[in-house]
Structure formats: structure tokens, C-alpha cells
Design a protein with these regions (language model features):
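Vicinal oxygen chelate
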Residues: 2-9, 41, 62-90, 114-116
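Core segments of cupin and vicinal oxygen chelate
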Residues: 7-56, 94, 98-111, 141-143, ...
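Conserved short beta-strand elements that form part of the metal-binding/catalytic scaffold
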Residues: 26-72, 112-136
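Generic structural hydrophobic/aromatic packing signal, biased to beta-strands
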Residues: 51, 81-83, 93-96, 103, ...
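Short secondary-structure transition/capping segments
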Residues: 72-86, 127-136, 149-161
Length: 161
């Protein structure tokens, strides 16, 4: 179980507030890294997303723990995550539109997601309840391995640059 993860954003407070709204939770400052915020889902699992200033790197620090180092912002990258929410699809799209973020309802074959492009650079796959049910049915241990093994490279979403 993943309890929390971190992403970078150009406006961490705004991003954390929007993510918290999508989750039905709350955004709070994240003191270990000044300028960062924590979008809390406020569920029994401690689920949340730490949002750091763009360019932040987490580097090893031995037994005292990792340290935060500020570098240059990067833009697009491969990191993304799927986030189940209790918010319905229409409200997800409205929240993304109000934030000025691109948002697309996508069919992944066995399940659907709403791609919300945080600051129009980083993707979060939002799973409203009906999409979460599809996703969980697909990712059951008895199904997901066989499905991934049988998948054809022809179904890849790779785009030449």
C-alpha cells in the first residue's frame, strides 16, 4: 500500500489545494521542506500527496534521513499516479478547468481514467468511484499479470518526437 508520494510543482500551495479538493481532503504546509504543502485525503490509510517546489530533489542523508535540495525546474516527466477519489467525474473536470489544467477522460481498455494535467506538466490519473471499480477489477492479482503479459506492443501509447 502506498500511503503518500511526492510531486514537484511550480505553485505547490495551489496544486496541493486542488489535489485536496479532488480528494475531498485538506491541504496543509509541509514544514520539513519550506514552501511545500501536503494534500491530505484524511482517510484511514494516511493517504496524501506531498507537493514540493519545482526542481526539488530528495537526496540521501544517512541515518538522519534524506535532505531537500533545490535545483532547476524540469517540466514534463514520466512520474504519474492513479488516485481514487469520491468526487464524481463532472466535478473532477470542473475543478481541473477552474485550476486552468488540461483534463481528459480516457479509455485505457479495461478501465477509464480522467487525466488531470497538474500545471499542464504532470499527469495524475483520477479515478472517480465508477472508474475505480473498473481499475480494481482489472488489477486483481488473478487478472493483472496475465493481462500485462498478453498485451501487444501495438497497443502502446508511445508517440515519436
Amino acid at each position: 500500500m502506498i500511503h503518500h508520494l511526492s510531486i514537484a510543482a511550480r505553485d505547490p500551495q495551489h496544486v496541493a489545494c486542488v489535489l485536496a479538493e479532488l480528494m475531498g481532503g485538506k491541504a496543509v504546509p509541509f514544514p520539513p521542506n519550506p514552501g511545500s504543502f501536503f494534500a491530505l485525503q484524511l482517510d484511514e490509510y494516511g493517504s496524501g500527496v506531498e507537493v514540493y517546489p519545482a526542481g526539488t530533489e530528495l537526496q540521501p542523508g544517512g541515518t538522519t534521513g534524506g535532505s531537500f535540495v533545490k535545483k532547476e525546474a524540469r517540466g514534463y516527466g514520466p512520474t504519474h499516479f492513479a488516485l481514487s477519489v469520491t468526487t464524481d467525474a463532472d466535478k473532477v473536470e470542473a475543478i481541473a478547468a477552474r485550476a486552468g489544467w488540461q483534463c481528459f477522460c480516457c479509455n485505457r481498455g479495461p478501465f477509464h481514467v480522467i487525466e488531470v494535467w497538474v500545471e499542464n506538466e504532470s499527469m495524475v490519473e483520477i479515478l472517480p468511484p465508477e472508474f475505480a471499480r473498473e481499475y480494481l477489477a482489472f488489477t486483481r492479482p488473478d487478472k493483472v499479470t496475465a493481462a500485462m503479459t498478453a498485451a501487444s506492443p501495438a497497443t502502446a501509447r508511445h508517440r515519436a518526437t
